[in-house]
Amino acid sequence: MRCLPVFVILLLLIASAPSVDAQLKTKDDVPLASFHDNAKGTQHKRIINWCCLIFYQCCLRR
Protein backbone atom coordinates (compact mmCIF):
# COMPACT_ATOMS: atom_id res chain seq x y z
CA MET A 1 0.00 0.00 0.00
CA ARG A 2 2.94 2.35 0.49
CA CYS A 3 3.67 2.20 -3.24
CA LEU A 4 0.19 3.20 -4.36
CA PRO A 5 0.60 6.97 -3.78
CA VAL A 6 3.89 6.94 -5.69
CA PHE A 7 2.31 5.29 -8.72
CA VAL A 8 -0.71 7.59 -8.60
CA ILE A 9 1.53 10.67 -8.56
CA LEU A 10 3.64 9.32 -11.42
CA LEU A 11 0.56 8.53 -13.49
CA LEU A 12 -0.82 12.02 -12.88
CA LEU A 13 2.48 13.55 -13.98
CA ILE A 14 2.48 11.48 -17.16
CA ALA A 15 -1.14 12.38 -17.92
CA SER A 16 -0.54 16.09 -17.35
CA ALA A 17 2.53 16.26 -19.59
CA PRO A 18 2.06 18.61 -22.55
CA SER A 19 1.12 16.91 -25.77
CA VAL A 20 3.37 17.18 -28.81
CA ASP A 21 0.47 16.75 -31.26
CA ALA A 22 -0.75 20.35 -31.34
CA GLN A 23 -1.45 20.40 -35.09
CA LEU A 24 -3.97 18.45 -37.10
CA LYS A 25 -2.66 15.20 -38.52
CA THR A 26 -2.24 14.79 -42.24
CA LYS A 27 -1.85 11.69 -44.34
CA ASP A 28 1.94 11.87 -43.90
CA ASP A 29 1.72 11.99 -40.09
CA VAL A 30 -0.08 8.67 -39.66
CA PRO A 31 3.09 6.54 -39.26
CA LEU A 32 4.23 8.86 -36.45
CA ALA A 33 1.26 7.83 -34.29
CA SER A 34 2.84 4.47 -33.51
CA PHE A 35 6.13 6.21 -32.78
CA HIS A 36 4.43 8.41 -30.16
CA ASP A 37 2.74 5.35 -28.60
CA ASN A 38 6.09 3.55 -28.41
CA ALA A 39 7.71 6.60 -26.79
CA LYS A 40 4.97 6.82 -24.16
CA GLY A 41 5.28 3.10 -23.42
CA THR A 42 9.06 3.37 -23.09
CA GLN A 43 8.71 6.36 -20.77
CA HIS A 44 6.21 4.47 -18.60
CA LYS A 45 8.55 1.44 -18.38
CA ARG A 46 11.46 3.66 -17.36
CA ILE A 47 9.41 5.28 -14.60
CA ILE A 48 8.31 1.89 -13.27
CA ASN A 49 11.89 0.58 -13.36
CA TRP A 50 13.09 3.72 -11.56
CA CYS A 51 10.40 3.28 -8.93
CA CYS A 52 11.39 -0.36 -8.45
CA LEU A 53 15.00 0.65 -7.86
CA ILE A 54 13.99 3.05 -5.11
CA PHE A 55 10.97 1.23 -3.65
CA TYR A 56 11.91 -2.44 -3.92
CA GLN A 57 8.66 -3.59 -2.28
CA CYS A 58 6.74 -2.40 -5.36
CA CYS A 59 8.51 -4.95 -7.55
CA LEU A 60 7.88 -7.89 -5.27
CA ARG A 61 4.15 -7.83 -6.06
CA ARG A 62 4.41 -7.77 -9.84
UniProtKB/Swiss-Prot annotation:
GO MF term (any one): toxin activity
Cellular compartment(s): Secreted
GO cellular component: extracellular region
Tissue-specificity statement: Expressed by the venom duct.
Signal peptide positions (record): 1-22
Family named by the database record: Belongs to the conotoxin T superfamily.
Protein name: Conotoxin Sr5.7
Lineage: Eukaryota, Metazoa, Spiralia, Lophotrochozoa, Mollusca
